Amino acid sequence: MTVVDIKIGNKYRIGRKIGSGSFGQIYLGLNTVNGEQVAVKLEPLKARHHQLEYEFRVYNILKGNIGIPTIRWFGVTNSYNAMVMDLLGPSLEDLFCYCGRKFTLKTVLLLADQLISRIEYVHSKSFLHRDIKPDNFLMKKHSNVVTMIDFGLAKKYRDFKTHVHIPYRDNKNLTGTARYASINTHIGIEQSRRDDLESLGYVLLYFCRGSLPWQGLQADTKEQKYQRIRDTKIGTPLEVLCKGLPEEFITYMCYTRQLSFTEKPNYAYLRKLFRDLLIRKGYQYDYVFDWMILKYQKRAAAAAAASATAPPQVTSPMVSQTQPVNPITPNYSSIPLPAERNPKTPQSFSTNIVQCASPSPLPLSFRSPVPNKDYEYIPSSLQPQYSAQLRRVLDEEPAP
């Protein structure tokens, strides 16, 4: 029996492979009862290390947050452990490539705000992610919400009840992705909250720069390659790494690198660092990312090309032939949502890499630095005073 012949939980049919996680393969799935598309992660029972059940348990602990996918089903079917979850949109790595392997500063700042919040939430549940990279952040379909995935390498760093931190250890093997690993991870120190945030710093710099200095290094063995990456990472001054970027990026990297092993990061401070930069640069917190603009421009160009090649229309002699044509003025805050697909017609997960690219017409919530206060995002066209509201939020001090 092949994978595509397997029926999961008596109602999910498996389609083609759409990706891989730290452990297991991911397939497109279809709910045969209501036609809803899902993602199915499979792990062979004969695998040397069984991690999928562990990942399922982590998801169960993290469930309920806006940036965590919902698990629909978990169990054993045929010769596989199987986990059925939300089908999400493209990853930030996919969108980065779609945008020519570089994001504008505005997009990086908008992403940073959500990514810091996702990491903070996972840490608040006593877990480290330990594999922070663009591939593990996906956009929700038809939404502007960044979702965090792949908790196969996640680790509990403190006791759930007492919050006693795990002890400091060294001589640890590198866990995660070497390109974004913290310096302490490279030198074998047990990971803690600071390492997730340092890894995020490298992700943000990757988005701004287009690449990192230690990419593409060659070596005979994996260990030698990791050593070259480590040496380059340690030997690259932050002034060089952040050259041409606002000083906030150096501040962020210095802060995360100077945290002690058990120290709780000030997530609100880091968010405010980038939010203040967003305001100082005059950007709107409007959830309009680079891929939305690029998608709009491509659609406008295609429409203009189609119009130019269309046969001329016969017009009435009473109508002036010299009437001016209004130019296309992009209104990125009102890009229409993609047409709803027929849920009974399975389509490729990557049929349109920017299915999530249109800003939602519905209000979106974002977490303020003030505990127990949620503020709704309203598109700038509906609430011009939003920037003033954001400033008011940032002026409030977080509770101790």
From Swiss-Prot:
ATP binds at residues 18-26, 41. GO terms for biological process: DNA repair; endocytosis; homologous chromosome segregation; meiotic sister chromatid arm separation; negative regulation of ergosterol biosynthetic process; negative regulation of transcription by RNA polymerase II; positive regulation of double-strand break repair; regulation of DNA repair. GO terms for molecular function: ATP binding; protein serine kinase activity; protein serine/threonine kinase activity; protein tyrosine kinase activity. One of its GO terms (cellular component) is cytoplasm. Residues 12-278 form the Protein kinase domain. Its EC number is 2.7.11.1. InterPro entries: CK1_Ser-Thr_kinase, Kinase-like_dom_sf, Prot_kinase_dom, Protein_kinase_ATP_BS, Ser/Thr_kinase_AS. Residues 330-352 are annotated as: Disordered. The active site is at residue 131. It is found in: Nucleus. Keywords: ATP-binding, DNA damage, DNA repair, Kinase, Nucleotide-binding, Nucleus, Serine/threonine-protein kinase, Transferase. It catalyses: L-seryl-[protein] + ATP = O-phospho-L-seryl-[protein] + ADP + H(+); L-threonyl-[protein] + ATP = O-phospho-L-threonyl-[protein] + ADP + H(+). Belongs to the protein kinase superfamily. CK1 Ser/Thr protein kinase family. Casein kinase I subfamily. Involved in DNA repair. May regulate the activity of protein(s) involved in double strand break repair caused by gamma rays. This is Casein kinase I homolog hhp2. The gene is hhp2.
